[in-house]
Amino acid sequence: MRPIRILAQPDDSTCGPTALHAVYAAFGLDLPLEQVIDEVHFLEDGGTLAVFLGIHALKEGFNVRIHTYNLRVFDPSWDGLPMEQLRRKLLAQTKFKTSKKLHSTCLAYSKFIKEGGEVRFDDPSPALLQSYFDRDLPVLTGLSATYLYKSKREYSGSMGESIYDDLRGKPMG
């Protein structure tokens, strides 16, 4: 398997771009971490999405496939649709749903597909992961830091600091 060296992420919201930077380096693309962080789109409330990382990778000339299990954005009946039809579904959905984050995510996936990205709905399995590892391809996966570190959910205090609170907090990272 291709060795991947990942730098320490500069702050709590840059794990995605930091991981993407490591993948770039493993494939010989030498970009400063700060540049990747500056160029990847971030959500208003911090952090990024796989699709924003994918758009950046497409712009850098990579082939990008996202396996999604996000039922807030994708309906299971969309599995197997041609990419252009999936793109139209994402855009049509924005007319019926009011969430600003969902709207932004749908538009980003539409752009991702238009720029040549592929969205798949394959069931997560060891065999799926192994199919990438057998081809010496890295896999980036989104995982909440709250889950990863088994920490309490958190919210931001008046000074922007993280306050851990299992009742009032939200998953972070």
Where are these regions (language model features)?
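Active-site nucleophile-adjacent alpha helix/oxyanion-hole segment immediately C-terminal to the catalytic cysteine
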Residues: 1-74, 82, 101, 107-110
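Active-site-adjacent substructure of cysteine-protease-like catalytic cores
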Residues: 39, 86-94, 99-173
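Short secondary-structure transition/capping segments
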Residues: 76-83, 153-154
